[in-house]
Amino acid sequence: MGSQARYNMFKIFNPEGCVKQLDFIRQTTELGGTAVGLKNRSVGVLIAHNERRSRLADIQKKVFSIDRKSLFTFSGITNDGLQIVDYLIDKSVREEVIKGRAIHFLDVFEDLLRDVFERTILDGRRLYGVSGLYMTEYDGIRLVEFNPKGHVREVKGMGIGCRAQSSRTVLEAYCEEYEKMGVEELVRIGIMALKNAHPEDDALTGENVEIWILEAGKAVYNIDAKVFLN
């Protein structure tokens, strides 16, 4: 009997040097729609590509408003992503109603990460099959990457989903200049990153690309992608 068959029931040990379940989850998130986020101190931009998999399917929403000053997008299993959206909305409302303040951009994931950690090390429960980007205003604009392995980190820019590494290449090339940029310039960098991941003609259209903006002191809003894709 091969080692893979003998050790498949274990979550945190495999003699081949990798945890198969975590590898499967990584592959799942990389099959999802591409999304990029980038920000400076006063402006944040989230751009998501939602490719239509079938002519019969409607294009679904990819960027979700958590509250007036927070956004979340994800790549991977849709039900898992929507579960995290509901979780973030609930945490935001509880913090505002009970404590009268905005929730910390990393602490908001505390309960979720505990659940992710338990799913990772204990057998019998399915792992989260989704990665995400959370943007909010908390002493400036903040961008946080959520990883299905059970950790979050603050970033200046990040790409997730299908061909995400190609989008990150562009984001990394301009990251030192983000602080000098306004809304339009940041959006153009984000579109450039998305095009690097999807260079095919007509891959990006006004119908399958969402652009959302968060400016310090203002509520989140979206803009027409056609303006930047033409």
UniProtKB/Swiss-Prot annotation:
InterPro entries: Ntn_hydrolases_N, Proteasome_alpha, Proteasome_alpha-type, Proteasome_sua/b. The keyword Kinase does not apply. Keywords: Cytoplasm, Nucleus, Proteasome. It holds the Pfam family Proteasome. It is found in: Cytoplasm; Nucleus. It comes from the Eukaryota. GO terms for cellular component: cytoplasm; nucleus; proteasome core complex, alpha-subunit complex. GO terms for biological process: proteolysis involved in protein catabolic process. The 26S proteasome consists of a 20S proteasome core and two 19S regulatory subunits. The 20S proteasome core is composed of 28 subunits that are arranged in four stacked rings, resulting in a barrel-shaped structure. The two end rings are each formed by seven alpha subunits, and the two central rings are each formed by seven beta subunits. The catalytic chamber with the active sites is on the inside of the barrel. The proteasome degrades poly-ubiquitinated proteins in the cytoplasm and in the nucleus. It is essential for the regulated turnover of proteins and for the removal of misfolded proteins. The proteasome is a multicatalytic proteinase complex that is characterized by its ability to cleave peptides with Arg, Phe, Tyr, Leu, and Glu adjacent to the leaving group at neutral or slightly basic pH. It has an ATP-dependent proteolytic activity. Belongs to the peptidase T1A family. This is Probable proteasome subunit alpha type-6. It comes from Encephalitozoon cuniculi (strain GB-M1). The gene is PRE5.
